[in-house]
């Protein structure tokens, strides 16, 4: 999915990706809203529980079918508490993505923040792909009154935190943290090589 996000990216837009059809719908970022990415901790999915999450969600799909089509009512069909929590994260995250797209189009910043914060809570508690360092970074970013919401991003187990922030506030908070990058609205992605 990372490669598709990069290849299909459009400056100043979010990309809503349908992972079944691979259709991409671009949604413009409202004026005055910026995306901040903070590198928190080096990570590698090798040696993490990432493959466990893949196996757990595959097991859930054996029980209730494709998670893409599942609803919270389907959770009652899962007896194992751990698998139920993994499924709950995926099911509710799918719904949050659609709600986020609608809130972005409507420029409902409070709702955008609520959805990001709930996503992080679910990643941390139900899917368990966060860690204390990442949780602390999310809490710290949320202390800035200009931040609407923050969450971990990517495969989890370290890596980056992303936040949505109003541009109208002073940037002093961010200048004190050299690992934060404000993503320019006018830049397009390029390729990187080692």
List the predicted regions and their residue ranges.
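C-terminal nucleotide
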Residues: 8-151, 164-194
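N-terminal pre-core extensions flanking Radical SAM catalytic domains
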Residues: 158-162
